[in-house]
Amino acid sequence: MKNKTTEVIFDLETQKFFDEIDDFDPAKLGVSVLSLYRRTVDKNNNEIEGEMLSFWEEDLKKTWEIFNKADRIIGFNSKRFDVLALKPYLPLELNKLPHFDILEQVKDVNGRRVSLDSIAGETLGKRKIDDPRNAITYWVKHDKVSLSKLKRYCEEDVVLTRDIYDFGLKNKKLIFKDYWNTVRTIEVDFSYPEITEKITDEDQGSLF
């Protein structure tokens, strides 16, 4: 891992429910707001600085530069949902960039998908601040108060995602209630992959 690493943790909300479109393509749902937490961490994964940013639909193209400069993009169910929902707005899929999906690893270990709220509740002792269905209701209402609630809801989900990621990275485990309402603990590995630098003939010569 580099001495300093840029990470972007993100989440988004959509304008429609799946039952409002003709298939299950997230790209047709429309994105209402995207919130992200951009930070710099040192080689020991300690945060040096960070900031929360939110973007409404008309400004989503501005996020590409932020994502493109990240050493790791972090989300929850982001590869199978958020990335697809963003396809109409960004020049390339985020999956083509260094992308870590927490749920992907949880499912690989657990064999089943687990909700963000369940992991946050048992791992962090925190919960979502609102019913997820209200996010679309707030967008439809579109008044100042509703949009403020929508933005805060999305940002708080980013905070949960960030804190779950940090807990898993540090403790190498996550805790949640499974399908049968049993509390389970699973081992996880959120560490960065080892980077093996290719040694050229010139580099090799300098070793002797």
Give the role of each language-model region.
Residues M1-N68:
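Conserved RNase H-like, two-metal-ion catalytic cores of nucleic-acid enzymes
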Residues D11-E13, D82, D101, D157:
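Acidic active-site catalytic centers that drive phospho-/nucleotidyl reactions
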Residues R39, L84-P88, S118-E122, D163, ...:
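Residue-level signal for well-ordered alpha-helical scaffold segments within enzymatic catalytic domains
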Residues E47-S118:
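Conserved DEDDh/DEDDy metal-dependent 3′-5′ exonuclease domain
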Residues R113-I129:
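A contiguous binding-surface segment within folded domains or other stable secondary-structure elements
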Residues L124-I186:
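Acidic, Mg2+-coordinating catalytic module of metal-dependent nucleases/exonucleases
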Residues N181-F208:
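Acidic catalytic cores of enzymes that act on phosphate-bearing nucleotides/polynucleotides
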